[in-house]
From Swiss-Prot:
Residues 1-26 are annotated as: Disordered. It comes from Caenorhabditis elegans. The chain crosses the membrane at residues 87-107. Changing residue 97 to D: In e1563; viable showing only slightly increased rate of thrashing behavior. One of its GO terms (molecular function) is SNAP receptor activity. Disruption phenotype: Worms exhibit arrested development after embryogenesis. Viable mutants appear lethargic with sporadic jerky movements and absent M3 pharynx motorneuron activity. All mutants are resistant to the acetylcholinesterase inhibitor aldicarb indicating impaired cholinergic transmission. It is found in: Cytoplasmic vesicle, Secretory vesicle, Synaptic vesicle membrane; Cell membrane; Synapse, Synaptosome. Belongs to the synaptobrevin family. Disulfide bonds: none annotated. The lineage of its organism: Eukaryota, Metazoa, Ecdysozoa, Nematoda, Chromadorea. Changing residue 66 to G: In js44; resist to aldicarb. This is Synaptobrevin-1. The keyword Transcription does not apply. It is a single-pass type IV membrane protein. Residues 1-86 are cytoplasmic.
Amino acid sequence: MDAQGDAGAQGGSQGGPRPSNKRLQQTQAQVDEVVGIMKVNVEKVLERDQKLSQLDDRADALQEGASQFEKSAATLKRKYWWKNIKMMIIMCAIVVILIIIIVLWAGGK
């Protein structure tokens, strides 16, 4: 009985590691799969970070360009406003001179 008991105990322990070993292999395969997925995810996150960085650089450049455009537009607006004022002053001066000439010419007759 002792020999059978020992053999039964060994047989039970031999049968035990095999399913446990299979479970370990399945678990390891799942872990490997998860590691692979996580590596892909990390690569995607790094690519996304790089793209976001490039987008941020573009946005900064665009903001700088918009600011420069705004300054140029304001300067141009002032320039043409003064040109318009000068033209109106010249036209008013011409009208005043014409009125003076007409008054003097009419007064001389």
